Design a protein with these regions (language model features):
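Secretory targeting and sorting signals
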Residues: 1-28
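Hydrophobic alpha-helical membrane segments, chiefly transmembrane helices and signal peptide h-regions
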Residues: 12-19, 61-65, 190-192
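Serine-esterase "nucleophile elbow" of acetyl-processing enzymes
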Residues: 25-82, 133-141
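Structured segments of extracytoplasmic/periplasmic soluble domains
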Residues: 39, 43, 66-70, 74, ...
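Solvent-exposed loop/turn segments at secondary-structure junctions
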Residues: 39-42, 73-74, 80-86, 120-125, ...
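Short acidic, glycine/proline-rich loop/turn micro-motifs
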Residues: 45-50, 89-90, 202
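Charged, often glycine-rich, active-site loop that binds/positions anionic groups
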Residues: 83-101
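Alpha-helical cap/lid subdomain in secreted, periplasmic
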Residues: 101-214
Length: 214
């Protein structure tokens, strides 16, 4: 009888680490993260690039990846260069000419963390920069007038400010849809960096007039 008990106890002790290990694996929490956004999220041409979606020019060391690596998240990064708020809901044409699925399709009810950078392409960021390039420190600009400010002012109204105001509800709509699809997720919105000095100019490194910089 004692031998039987001893054998049972020994078997139980030997099995315990296996059972505990299996339980730990089964209950170990994983944090599911989704990266959404445009080129400022995707990191175009920063190597190494993501081969799964070459048309998005998405880096494997963009900020969604860096955050996920630091925090230990399981990441699904669908950020895509050139994306607008519309591309959150509908297919986007990548730089390779192929269709890119709507970014919001990556969200699940189990998603825990979402990062988002969007809106710059809605206001036409690239075109604005191109139009504002000045041929000399005092102008004219590529758009024609001496300053970019003059080009984007019509009837006394700042057209760029109007574009920004019109983009806000579009971003709000994206955030609302994220909440609907992933109600438990924590969403972080990363803005855009300041690329101009507070005052003055640094022509020709930044080929803009002092008026447009200030």
């Amino acid at each position: 009888m004692r031998r039987t008990i001893r054998t049972a106890v020994t078997a139980g002790l030997l099995a315990a680490p296996v059972l505990l290990g299996a339980a730990a694996c089964a209950t170990a929490p994983t944090t599911e993260a989704v990266g959404l956004g445009d080129s400022y999220a995707a990191g175009p041409l920063i190597t190494p690039q993501d081969p799964s979606s070459p048309g998005c020019l998405r880096s494997l060391v963009d900020y969604p990846h860096r955050v996920a690596l630091q925090k230990g998240y399981v990441l699904h990064d669908v950020s895509c260069s050139g994306a607008t708020t519309d591309d959150m809901f509908a297919s986007q044409t990548g730089y390779d000419g192929k269709a890119v699925p709507p970014q919001l399709n990556a969200l699940r009810s189990t998603t825990d963390v979402v990062t988002l950078t969007i809106g710059g392409n809605d206001i036409g960021f690239t075109g604005i920069i191109e139009n504002c390039i000045a041929f000399t420190p005092t102008g004219p600009t590529r758009s024609g007038p001496k300053t970019c400010k003059a080009f984007y002012t019509a009837g006394g109204t700042d057209q760029l400010a109007a574009r920004i105001a019109a983009t806000r509800p579009k971003v709000d709509k994206v955030l609302q849809e994220i909440k609907r699809r992933s109600p438990s997720a924590s969403t972080s919105v990363a803005g855009y960096p300041a690329i101009l000095p507070e005052a003055g100019a640094c022509y020709p490194q930044l080929p803009l007039t002092p008026t447009d910089v200030g």
